[in-house]
Amino acid sequence: MLTPDELRATVDDIASVQSADGRIPWVPDGKTDPWNLVEAAMALDVGGRHDDAARAYDWLHDRRLPHGGWHSYYVGDEVTDPTLDTNVSAYVAVGVWHHYLSTDDTAFLRRMWPVVEAVFDHVLEFQSTT
């Protein structure tokens, strides 16, 4: 378990690499993927940096593809791996719900719920009958 000082240092480090538009790369100026961005945003929420976490979800909101998912990797605004992964895309819903539970921010949930619905629709397109 992290001490309060360790938690603060961890979330401060995450916030230090977050860009103004909300993107959270693995390392400064490095690649970003939806799964790890959600993990980082959830850590920001645990550390009480709710506005920073919301900006991360806004980044995802603004880059959602028409079918409901995201590409696998981005550097800045450039797609560096156009692979589509339903597992990664669906994880965004976990983060959205975690942020809501951390903040009780119903305006955030209303803004992000269409994203959650779209990603579930996208993922369920790949569900098999067997």
Name the predicted role of every residue range:
Residues 1-35, 46-59, 64-70:
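Low-complexity, Ser/Thr/Pro/Gly-enriched N-terminal "stalk/linker" regions
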Residues 40:
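Catalytic cores of nucleic-acid ligases and guanylyltransferases
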Residues 48-130:
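Helix-terminus loop motifs that line ligand-binding clefts
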